[in-house]
């Protein structure tokens, strides 16, 4: 258990190789040095976390429980994630995507295309995509790579849209 932590991906893997060595997704390196404040309980297979984290890519606030982290690609999770001006494009290596601010409830499994299957519901207050900053998005659906099925609504000054259907990202 810990309540305050200042570290990086490389430091964590070096300090706790038997606990975290093969469980942290490598894209977490992109967060750089981070400062985490809150309550976190961590074992080889389980995380219970309620924290706020400042990173090189932006702020993250989260309250979640994650099981089966010993096989992180298929880990299960449930909770809430808040991103504030977070550079999602850099984090996921997608050049058309930029910064995002959101508040989402999540319930699912997996972090890779092979295993990802997640229910998401919440608000995206701002999202930079293709050099435009969209505002006032709402989502409620299931994301199972490469398919999103559910509702999306956008109430942006340049786009008013309500969608209920399926999107194939291939």
Regions found by a protein language model. Give the residues of each.
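Interface amphipathic segments
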Residues: 1-170
């Amino acid at each position: 258990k810990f309540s305050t932590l200042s570290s990086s991906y490389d430091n964590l893997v070096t300090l706790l190789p038997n606990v975290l060595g093969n469980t942290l997704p490598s894209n977490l390196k992109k967060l750089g040095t981070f400062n985490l404040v809150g309550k976190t309980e961590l074992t080889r297979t389980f995380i219970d976390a309620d924290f706020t984290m400042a990173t090189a890519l932006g702020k993250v606030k989260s309250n979640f429980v994650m099981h089966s982290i010993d096989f992180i690609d298929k880990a299960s999770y449930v909770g809430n994630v808040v991103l504030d001006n977070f550079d999602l494009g850099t984090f996921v290596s997608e050049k058309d995507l930029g910064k995002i601010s959101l508040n989402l409830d999540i319930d699912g499994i997996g972090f890779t295309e092979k295993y990802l299957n997640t229910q998401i519901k919440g608000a995206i207050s701002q999202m930079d995509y293709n050099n435009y900053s969209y505002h006032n998005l709402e989502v409620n659906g299931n994301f199972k790579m490469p398919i999103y099925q559910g509702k999306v609504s956008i109430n942006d000054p340049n786009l008013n849209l309500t969608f209920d259907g399926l999107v194939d990202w291939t």
